[in-house]
Curated annotation (Swiss-Prot):
Gene3D superfamilies: mg296 homolog like (1.20.120.510), mpn423 like domain (1.20.890.20). This is Uncharacterized protein MG296. It comes from Mycoplasma genitalium (strain ATCC 33530 / DSM 19775 / NCTC 10195 / G37) (Mycoplasmoides genitalium). Transmembrane segments: none annotated. It comes from the Bacteria.
Length: 129
C-alpha cells in the first residue's frame, strides 16, 4: 500500500479510537442526515449498495466501533490504484470519508472546516467540504 495512504488511514484510525464512540455515533448520524438531505436518492436505490460510511450507525456500539476500523482498512485497499499517485489515492480516500471526518472533528470539538484544512495541509489533498 502507498505510504501516504497508510499514514492517512492510520491517522484517522488513531483519531477515531481517541474519541468517545457514543458521542461520535450521534454526531456521525447527524452529519449523515444533513448530507443525505442534499443527495438525490431514487426509490430503486438498494440500501445494501450504499457504502458503509453512507449508512447510519445504529446497531451495537462495540460491533460498529470494530467495524469502522475494518472498513477504513477495506476502503484504503479499494481506493488504492497502482496507476494513481499517492496524492490521488489519498484524495479518493478522503472523498469517501467526508461525513466520517466531519463527525470526527465535531466529536473532538474542532471546527470541521479547520479539521478538513488540517488534512489538506498534512496529506496534500484538495478539500471538498
Amino acid at each position: 500500500m502507498k505510504p501516504q495512504l497508510i499514514a492517512f488511514k492510520k491517522f484517522l484510525q488513531t483519531e477515531f479510537q481517541a474519541v468517545d464512540f457514543e458521542t461520535f455515533r450521534i454526531n456521525f448520524n447527524l452529519c449523515l442526515k444533513r448530507e443525505q438531505d442534499n443527495i438525490v436518492i431514487y426509490e430503486d436505490d438498494d440500501y445494501d449498495d450504499q457504502p458503509f460510511f453512507f449508512k447510519p450507525m445504529l446497531s451495537d456500539g462495540f460491533f460498529i466501533q470494530t467495524e469502522v476500523i475494518k472498513q477504513l482498512d477495506y476502503l484504503a485497499k479499494v481506493v488504492e490504484n497502482p496507476k494513481d499517485s499517492d496524492q490521488q489515492c489519498c484524495q479518493n480516500f478522503y472523498e469517501a470519508l467526508i461525513v466520517f471526518i466531519s463527525a470526527l472533528a465535531i466529536t473532538k470539538g474542532i471546527n470541521p472546516n479547520r479539521f478538513h484544512q488540517r488534512l489538506v495541509n498534512r496529506f496534500a489533498i484538495h478539500a471538498v467540504y
